[in-house]
Structure formats: C-alpha cells, structure tokens
C-alpha cells in the first residue's frame, strides 16, 4: 500500500513538473533567440562598456581552431568557430551614434558584422585592417590581452605581432588592453 501511494505521488509530481516546464525550442528557434540576444548585447550593452572603458575601437582577432574566448560570444549561432583569420572591428563614433561593426574578412559574420575586406580590391587583410583603423582615427584601441584575467587574454603572440607591425607608430601607442 505504501509503495502504491509512493509511486502514485511520484507519478503526479513528475507529471506536474513536466507540465510546468517550458517547451524545449528546436534548433532554428534557439538560433533565433541566440542571434537576437547577440544583436541586443551589441546595440545596448557594448556601447556602454566601451564608453565606461574609454575604448573607441575594439579589435578581436582570431584564427580558426585557436579562437579568442571572447570572439565566440560575438559569432552568430550557426558558427562554431572563427574561419581562417577572423577579425572583428567594433568602432564607437561617439555622440550616441550606433556602433560600427565590421568584419575584416571575405564574408559577413552573421547579420551584425559586415564584410569590410575584398582581397581583390584591397589586397592584404592586415593592410585593410590598418586602413580601416586609420580612417576612423580612434583615441584608444582595445585588444584582448591581459596579465591577470585569462578570458581577456585571447590574442595569440603571432596575431599580436602581426597587428602591431601593421599599425603606423602613432596608432601603436593607442593600443590598450580591452580587459
């Protein structure tokens, strides 16, 4: 009798819990939610973070299979990793204007980061990045390096050196940690 009551109670509690649980979204619906939140973060949270950190421009550089931990949070839901070399450039023009979000890559990176490099038109990828930075003339350029916070230390030594060599001297002095 006690077993019968116990299993009946267990059955009803399980049934009640399953009825109260939200439905699990399908893959497409999940992707839409993820991409929506990415757009929301980029348009509302990121401008305030950049303003508070006094960073006009944030450059995220990552290579396929060796991603910066932060870049993954900016990739669209359908991407699992960076492709070849993915460079995202986020520029805050100030005066409460929306952020400019560019991909120095051969393709758009989702709906947010628009393609800003055509190899046939612009030549080398690093040169194009330097041109885009010079055109915007930011006061402070954040990149992901840090001595104290591992997740903010995503740029590799090679990528850092190539980035540094690409910039003219006056812009090199403006590079800061984006931690």
Where are these regions (language model features)?
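A composition/biophysics-driven feature that prefers long, compositionally simple stretches
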Residues: 19-179
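Positively charged n-region of N-terminal signal peptides that target proteins for export
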Residues: 1-4
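Bacterial N-terminal signal peptides
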Residues: 7-16
